[in-house]
Swiss-Prot record:
Entry's Gene Ontology cellular component terms: extracellular region
Protein name: Omega-theraphotoxin-Hhn1a 3
Organism name: Cyriopagopus hainanus
Main subcellular location: secreted
Keywords: Disulfide bond, Ion channel impairing toxin, Knottin, Secreted, Signal, Toxin
């Protein structure tokens, strides 16, 4: 009877250890995924700043905006200029 209780407690301790290690690995994976997402977002913002501004992007003149967009005079963001051609 005593040995069964000892084995059960040992099994529970082992299970707790495995679950703890699994949780730590899960947290590390989550940190890596979030870090990759932040890097991708930063790269996208830098690419947008190097090229033309997309819809509702900040601007100071029409030349800052992409094709078929113009700089709104009051709010200083790129809006559609009303054209449909390619």
């Amino acid at each position: 009877m005593k040995s069964i209780v000892f084995v059960a407690l040992f099994g529970l301790a082992l299970l707790a250890l495995v679950c703890s290690a699994s949780e730590d690995a899960h947290k590390e994976l989550l940190k890596e995924v979030v870090g990759a997402m932040v890097v991708d977002t930063t790269d996208a913002v830098q690419a947008e700043e190097r090229e033309c501004r997309w819809y509702l992007g900040g601007c100071s003149q029409d030349g800052d905006c992409c094709k078929h967009l113009q700089c709104h005079s009051n709010y200083e963001w790129c809006v559609w200029d009303g054209t449909f051609s390619k």
